[in-house]
Amino acid sequence: MTTDLNQNPYLVRAQQLLCRVPLIDGHNDFPFIIRGLYQNNLTRASLNDLPIGQTDISRLRQGSVGGQFWSAYVPNPVHSDKESDEAYLECLRQTLQQIDVIHRMVSEHPDVFGLAQSAADVWKIFRAGRIASLIGIEGLHQIAHSPSALRMMHKLGVRYATLCHTKNNRYCDSAVDRHTSSPWSEYGGQTHDPGDEPSRNVRTGFHSLTLKYLTAVHGRIVDLSHTSEATQRDAIAISKAPVIFSHSASSSLTPSPRNVTDEILHQLKRNGGLIMVCFLRDLVNSADDANTTGSRVVDHILYIAETIGYDHVGIGSDFDGMLEGPLGLDDVSRFPELVADLFRRGVSEERIEKIVGLNTLRVMKQVEDVAVREQAEGSTGVLCDVVKPIWTAEQRQMLAEQGRTRGLRP
């Protein structure tokens, strides 16, 4: 991948295309870099040119980024019981901090960013010359077992939810967690025995309701990156709306539990969903590839496109979730070179437009439409938190007596 604009006609075409269609990246952990470097104190931060990481305003502009899903990532609790409140409430607190820092990043740089909550918002912000900023959470451990928290996160702009990260949770299994000792049947899950695979899925009970509710709450996208294959299979079967993989790649090209099998890809196509190809070296390299290059990312994009069609592939870098990206595609400034390589390989302009952003916008709009329809039909109820009693039996009796004096029964 060359960076010489004068010597690369494909790069010229790439820059022209990215002026017309927003390049929307499915996953970037820049907010976690801000947390680590500045403890979320933006008064100390210069976001224009950061000394570390793969993202800052200067490089976003160089990379012609039109839209970005910022991850409000918080790690899984360490050594905690799945049902203990304390560890998960801390995850929820930190999640709110990360959502807040994204909001402040946008509000303190209004000439650069705009908060997008719909596909229409993305177009409006992009056409105004700004970067449409969307929010995702990376694992349902971040909601602390609280549907109320999930609803409030939507009001704060969270538009996709990854079902899990690197640990199993009460909703589904992770691709990389082999620990299966907790009593899953309490929550309605089915057990099966696929060898070394995690032993739970999302098909029944609480999990199924939660999955449907994710979509029905005003159009939240279900993200299956990091989930086990069994979870992927069941989630796609359950979902009435397109799902995404926000940062994954093909397991046929690079075998990894984090990547997606051809079988799941074909299910994803039938669902109308989208896989956004990750740049993480371990997910895109080949066995004999000592130095992973950006061209390897293009290999994955083209393999997926040829397997299930150009309507179902996008870009999900995972920048700032890795120490270094592929050679030639090592930070957000290099996106145009990825597009140039697609041109060089003979991909049509129409298909590249789909890859860089139109597919993502289609999925967003379809999920929004499903949510509107589900709410209009009243087909999805309201999930409620388990709320601990706040009154004693005596207090309840006293209040009930007051009601009875008015001819009412509580």
Curated annotation (Swiss-Prot):
Chain segments carrying region Disordered: 180-200
Binding-site residues, substrate: 165, 258, 318
Domain of life from the UniProt record: Eukaryota
Catalytic activity annotation: an L-aminoacyl-L-amino acid + H2O = 2 an L-alpha-amino acid
Record note on disruption phenotype: Impairs the production of acetylaranotin and accumulates chemically stable intermediate cyclo-L-phe-L-phe or shunt products such as 2-hydroxy-2'-ene-cyclo-L-Phe-L-Phe and 2-imino-10'-hydroxy-cyclo-L-Phe-L-Phe.
Example GO molecular function: metallodipeptidase activity
Annotated metabolic or biological route of this protein: Mycotoxin biosynthesis
Residues annotated to bind Zn(2+): 27, 29, 138
GO biological process, one term: proteolysis
Top-level EC class: hydrolase
Cofactor(s) of this protein: Zn(2+)
Record keywords: Dipeptidase, Hydrolase, Metal-binding, Metalloprotease, Protease, Zinc
Record InterPro entries: Metal_Hydrolase (IPR032466), Pept_M19 (IPR008257)
The family this protein is said to belong to: Belongs to the metallo-dependent hydrolases superfamily. Peptidase M19 family.
Designated name of the protein: Dipeptidase ataJ
